[in-house]
């Protein structure tokens, strides 16, 4: 019985032919046959020389008929390992190659049958390997891969594994795939209930698994032969390893739904910074109320008329004169063309009847000049804006109420320009006098129908609360000064007296800071918009109606500049 099994075992090994001398592998170690154990094995191996001319296809068919079990998939790790003790039942995987094996009985060393290493099941748990493993099925025609054979002895040789570079590599272990038999045919042989001594089988069945180390391949390379490559990194636990690192030079992906409408703000800012801004402010009041000083304090520059004009040329005018001076102011890259319009002689005469008419005429003349520039056929690309945007009206700090001149002037000019009333030299009033004086002025404005800026009818929804607070402060009790002092280590603008220093920008001393915020920091653009959209628009409609009626009657009529 035992002899028959040995005979069957030898028949299963009659699968490879002798390889021609020119195709002898460069590294071949042969194992001597155990003639003492098996008596008839020498005769069987001598018969192999006769079968050298048989084709490789016939050998594959012979083995496929004798294969009692399907092929087994196994995973071998790179590196030579000492053989482990095998059980009585051993499963073998035979790698069929089209090359012939040169085998002679007289040559010492084991015969090369191209057998896979026997996989011993249930003895040792494989250790985790930090490298990525790719299972690849070797085709018989692929001869370009490097084959590294382990030595037949149990002690591994030092030169068994080739030394490779330090680049990260993945180990490809060749296993057969039963589902793809036409592409990668690897029929296995199984020995069951073998009672032969293990020492006899090790000489014949010592595995020589072809292990190939290849450099790391990217995703495109792994898709070349999808029928014979199974990438273990496709598992969810290795999905993160396959992701390529993001380059540092790559920009963050732009939102797909982003259009770029918000860039219009930057475009408008660049255009406005290039063109600059224009602001025209008029100061009206009697002489000696500190009009020029307040303007210098507002813009912290010597921009008033008196600051530029020599004192020797200063004289008391017999009539009201309108004088303007223009400055180019730049702060943090923002340029503004500031025009200050002064009205010397207003209210300084004995008879102040109709003293407001020159001021009204000047305001309407600026509207007319701007209108003529608009209606021209070949008008300028940018029309110079000389319209009066704001008028500061200085009220003397009498402590009583408004004078008839003040009421008449503000009543007429509030319809054509933005009027902001201020109490000049408010430091001459006590706190109680200031509160009482402001209440009297507010009641006089309401009783005479004088609508000062900010007008309630022009309020926008988001500015209503802010404008209400400003309206409660009107008229602003201000103090102007262009002298600097050191108070508690800080530089301030103020007025120094025997009893202390009045700080101009201190809201507990005066309301100059609120006036500056209204005119410059919060409402400057709104003041210009109301001038253009409300006051100038009313003047333009009136002039166009007058022009149409004059053309209908055939009469040329001079534009009225006295009053709207």
UniProtKB/Swiss-Prot annotation:
Query: Where is it located?
Result: Cytoplasm, Cytoskeleton
Q: What is its main location?
A: cytoplasm
Keyword vocabulary terms for this entry = Acetylation, Cell cycle, Cell division, Cytoplasm, Cytoskeleton, GTP-binding, Nucleotide-binding, Phosphoprotein
The highest taxon in the source lineage is Eukaryota
**Pfam families the UniProt entry points to:** Septin (PF00735)
Q: Where is the composition biased (Basic and acidic residues)?
A: 116-134
Gene Ontology BP, a term: protein localization
> Where N-acetylmethionine occurs along the chain?
1
Q: Which residues bind GTP?
A: 285-292, 319, 345, 425-433, 480, 495
Q: Where is the composition biased (Polar residues)?
A: 95-109, 190-203
Annotated region G3 motif: where? 342-345
Q: State which tissues express it.
A: Expressed in the brain, mainly in the perikarya and processes of astrocytes in the cerebellum, dentate gyrus and corpus callosum (at protein level). In the sciatic nerve, highly expressed in Schwann cells (at protein level). Isoforms are differentially expressed in testes, kidney, liver, heart, spleen and brain. Undetectable in skeletal muscle.
Q: Which PROSITE patterns match?
A: G_SEPTIN
Please explain the role this protein plays, according to its UniProt record: Filament-forming cytoskeletal GTPase. May play a role in cytokinesis (Potential).
Its name, as the record gives it, is Septin-9
- From the UniProt record, report the name of the gene that encodes this protein: Septin9
């Amino acid at each position: 019985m035992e002899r028959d099994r040995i005979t069957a075992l030898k028949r299963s090994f009659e699968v490879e032919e002798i390889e021609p001398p020119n195709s002898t592998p460069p590294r071949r170690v042969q194992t001597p046959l155990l003639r003492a154990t098996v008596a008839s094995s020498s005769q069987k191996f001598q018969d192999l020389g006769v079968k050298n001319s048989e084709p490789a296809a016939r050998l594959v068919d012979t083995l496929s008929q004798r294969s009692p079990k399907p092929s087994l998939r196994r995973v071998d790790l790179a590196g030579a390992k000492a053989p482990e003790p095998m059980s009585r039942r051993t499963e073998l995987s035979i790698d069929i190659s089209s090359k012939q094996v040169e085998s002679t009985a007289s040559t010492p060393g084991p015969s090369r049958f191209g057998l896979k290493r026997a996989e011993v099941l249930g003895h040792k748990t494989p250790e985790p390997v930090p490298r990525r493993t790719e299972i690849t099925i070797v085709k018989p025609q692929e001869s370009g891969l490097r084959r590294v054979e382990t030595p037949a002895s149990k002690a591994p040789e030092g030169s068994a594994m080739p030394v490779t570079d330090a680049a990260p590599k993945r180990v490809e272990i060749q296993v057969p795939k039963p589902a793809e038999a036409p592409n990668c045919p690897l029929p296995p042989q199984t020995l069951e209930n073998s009672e032969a001594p293990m020492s006899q089988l090790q000489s014949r069945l010592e595995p020589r698994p072809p292990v190939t180390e290849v450099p790391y391949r990217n995703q495109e390379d792994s898709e070349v032969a999808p029928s014979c490559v199974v990438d273990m990194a496709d598992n969810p636990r290795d999905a993160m390893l396959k992701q390529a690192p993001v380059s540092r030079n790559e920009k963050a992906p732009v939102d797909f739904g982003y259009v770029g409408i918000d860039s219009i703000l930057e475009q408008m800012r660049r255009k406005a910074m290039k063109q600059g801004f224009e602001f025209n402010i008029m100061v009206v009041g009697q002489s000696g109320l500190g009009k020029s000083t307040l303007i210098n304090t507002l813009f912290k520059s010597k921009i008033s008329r008196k600051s530029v004009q020599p004192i020797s040329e200063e004289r008391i005018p017999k009539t009201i004169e309108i004088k303007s001076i223009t400055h180019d102011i730049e702060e943090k890259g923002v340029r503004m063309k500031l025009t200050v319009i002064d009205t010397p002689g207003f209210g300084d005469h004995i008879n102040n009847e109709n003293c407001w008419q020159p001021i009204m005429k000047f305001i309407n003349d600026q509207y007319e000049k701007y209108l003529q520039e608009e209606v021209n056929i070949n008008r300028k690309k940018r029309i110079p804006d000389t319209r009066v945007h704001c008028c500061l009206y200085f009220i003397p700090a009498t402590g009583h109420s408004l004078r008839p001149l003040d009421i008449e002037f503000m009543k007429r000019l509030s319809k054509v320009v933005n009027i902001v009333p201020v109490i000049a030299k408010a430091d001459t009033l006590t706190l109680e006098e200031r509160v009482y004086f402001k209440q009297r002025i507010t009641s006089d404005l309401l009783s005479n129908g004088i609508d000062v800026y900010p007008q309630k009818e022009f309020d926008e929804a988001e500015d209503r609360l802010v404008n209400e607070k400003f309206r409660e402060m009107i008229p602003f009790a201000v103090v102007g000064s262009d002298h600097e002092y050191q108070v508690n280590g800080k530089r301030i603008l103020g007025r120094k007296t025997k009893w202390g220093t009045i700080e101009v920008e201190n809201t507990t001393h005066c309301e100059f800071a609120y006036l500056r915020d209204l005119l410059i920091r919060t409402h400057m653009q709104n003041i210009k918009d109301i001038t253009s959209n409300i006051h100038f628009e009313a003047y333009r409609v009136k002039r166009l109606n007058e022009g149409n009626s004059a053309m209908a009657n055939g009469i040329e009529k001079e534009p009225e500049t006295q009053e709207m």
